[in-house]
Design a protein with these regions (language model features):
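Contiguous, structured surface segment used for ligand recognition
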Residues: 2
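Glycine/proline-enriched, intrinsically flexible loops and inter-domain linkers
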Residues: 6-549
Length: 549
């Protein structure tokens, strides 16, 4: 809003706030983005809160429960070994950051773990089984299971883009050898807790993953899938009485289906990626004393895009590459999303779980995308590597960028929207719509010119070092995060899942042929069978002009 006034040559405006009256103190509002005031005066812009200092963690076990870190006993033992290696206790930023970086959400520990079933260790992990298909039948797959997206060989296509993206220039047409990108990921926990923003940031994060494939690529269209317990629309249908209505922890299935589809569609519409397909499944069942249902919902965001074959693989970082962040400021938003989303919803307090939910900003993401698109369209792409800021914010994204070489981050260069943030909150907040890039030093000025044209906030926050060490350094020289890359990623213990085979049998379906018409009517009413337009056709599905029906 402030930038709009600046573009209109309205000087002297540094901050714009929106206020609206409410009846009483019980009025609903988003505590991350809004605050309830008893009156408006100049003092509302003042705060006496100071950033919390760097804290040494004396007891990792207590910290684990207090902060909702979802660390396993084996991981806690591992951190004690790291303390011994360092000869010191870990900081709150290091413990918190490690928990996010190595959460199930970020590292797929269950999929990559060891399974022992009926006393026998399985010959491969779930991830290895999935990868086996591609290994044995690669066909046209170029890259899979090692980047933000998968790429398959595409056709030769025409690219219509400016010759020089840093200035007003003629558009030229040239042939490029393309790759097709595919991506899907769940955003279950955030959508369960706060459906609109949960689904919106799920869609936004999936788009950023396609932006961050190789050294940059372009999203085209999105999809969304929702799975919930029965919504009981209009008072409920008779088969929905199989289980009593639960006291839902956050939102009802009906609210989730409506708000989540609103959120996913809204983000795509504002960003400029149409949501063109989707699905929904509602299910509950009770038999043999066991109850089944999608009480913790599934929200699957997916999409397709394309890029150039030239850019489909990341390059090797070299010492001296500049670490660049594109996008918005840091706020107290989305703290601990990786770890909290990796356990059962409801395990931690409402405060911890609500703090872990991100908030969407599609306009900022569009600005970041415009810059990345421009760099990928040029004859020389200056991007060495690229990752999106999702779970765990800077500490996860930037550490992935420098995983092969190490790096140092100057915290003074990180954009701060809330001056009360502690070092831990700056390092690990999940303020959305940011991308991390490694840029060759020689191209930095050119990239900055394009960023200014696209109004994409760009910050040079550090550089790669080549010493396999990663640290965040404050202005005073203190290091709230200071670990070897190997200590962050390399040797955390494998997850071991022990289970046994359980034989189950269910009653056969019984029916009367005379009731076929009724059965058919009921089946056609199921959300999984009925028309999905109410979920997928909410907004413009031809935005960008690249999708036709």
């Amino acid at each position: 809003a402030v930038e709009i006034t600046q573009n209109m040559n309205m000087g002297g405006i540094t901050r714009i706030e929106e206020y609206f009256p409410v009846k009483d103190e019980q009025a609903a509002f988003d505590p991350m983005l809004q605050r309830l005031y008893h009156g408006l005066d100049q003092k509302i812009f003042e705060t006496t809160r100071k950033p919390e200092p760097i804290r040494i963690v004396e007891n990792i076990e207590e910290e684990n429960e207090k902060e909702g870190l979802a660390l396993s006993p084996e991981e806690i033992d591992y951190l004690h070994k790291v303390e011994s290696q360092l000869g010191r206790k870990l900081t709150d930023s290091e413990v918190f950051g490690f928990a996010q970086i190595n959460s199930e959400h970020c590292r797929h520990k269950i999929f990559g773990g060891i399974f022992i079933i009926d006393g026998k260790e399985m010959p491969s992990s779930l991830f290895a089984m999935i990868k086996k298909t591609t290994k044995e039948h690669p066909h046209k797959i170029i890259s899979a299971y090692k980047d933000n997206v998968a790429f398959a060989q595409g056709p030769v296509v025409e690219q219509f883009a400016p010759e020089d993206q840093s200035t007003s220039d003629y558009f030229v047409i040239k042939d490029i050898e393309s790759v097709i990108s595919l991506k899907a990921e769940t955003h279950n926990f955030p959508t369960t807790v706060e459906p609109f923003n949960g689904a919106a940031t799920g869609t936004g994060g999936e788009i950023r993953d396609r932006m961050g494939g190789g050294t940059g690529s372009w999203p085209i269209a999105g999809t969304a899938v929702y799975m919930t317990a029965y919504p009981r629309l209009g008072g409920g249908r008779k088969w929905e009485n199989v289980l009593p209505v639960r006291k839902w922890l956050y939102q009802t299935p009906e609210q989730i289906l409506i708000k989540a589809s609103n959120g996913a569609s809204d983000f795509g519409n504002k960003f400029g990626q149409p949501l063109i397909a989707g699905s929904v499944l509602t299910f509950e069942h009770q038999e043999n004393g066991e109850k089944y249902g999608y009480d913790k919902v599934i929200m699957l965001a997916g999409g397709v895009g394309y890029g150039t074959k030239r850019d489909c693989l990341k390059k090797e970082p070299q010492p001296g590459n500049k670490i660049v962040v594109i996008g918005g400021d840091n706020y107290r938003i989305g703290l601990g999303g990786g770890s909290v989303s990796s356990v059962d919803t409801g395990r931690y307090s409402n405060g911890i779980e609500l703090n872990a939910i991100q908030r969407a900003n599609p306009e900022m993401q569009k600005r970041a995308y415009n810059l990345i698109r421009a760099l990928c369209e040029e004859n020389v792409n200056p991007i060495v590597s690229i990752h999106d800021h999702g779970s765990a914010g800077h500490v996860n994204c930037l550490s992935e960028l420098v995983e092969d070489c190490g790096g140092v981050i100057d915290m003074e260069k990180l954009p701060i929207g809330d001056k009360t943030l502690s070092a831990k909150e700056i390092i690990a907040n999940e303020s959305q719509e940011r991308m991390g890039l490694l840029i060759d030093r020689q191209h930095l000025g050119h990239v900055q010119k394009i960023a200014e044209r696209e109004r994409a906030p760009m910050y040079v926050v550090g550089e790669t070092t080549g010493d396999a060490h990663f640290s965040f350094v404050q202005k005073d020289g203190e290091k709230p995060f200071d670990l070897d890359v190997a200590q962050m990623f390399g040797h955390s213990p494998k997850t071991v899942m022990v289970d046994e085979t359980v034989e189950r049998s269910y009653e056969d379906v019984t029916y009367e042929t005379s009731n076929i018409s009724e059965y058919l009517t009921n089946v056609l009413q199921l959300e999984a069978v009925a028309c999905k337009d109410w979920l997928t056709n909410k907004v413009d599905r031809s935005v960008t002009g690249k999708v036709a029906r």
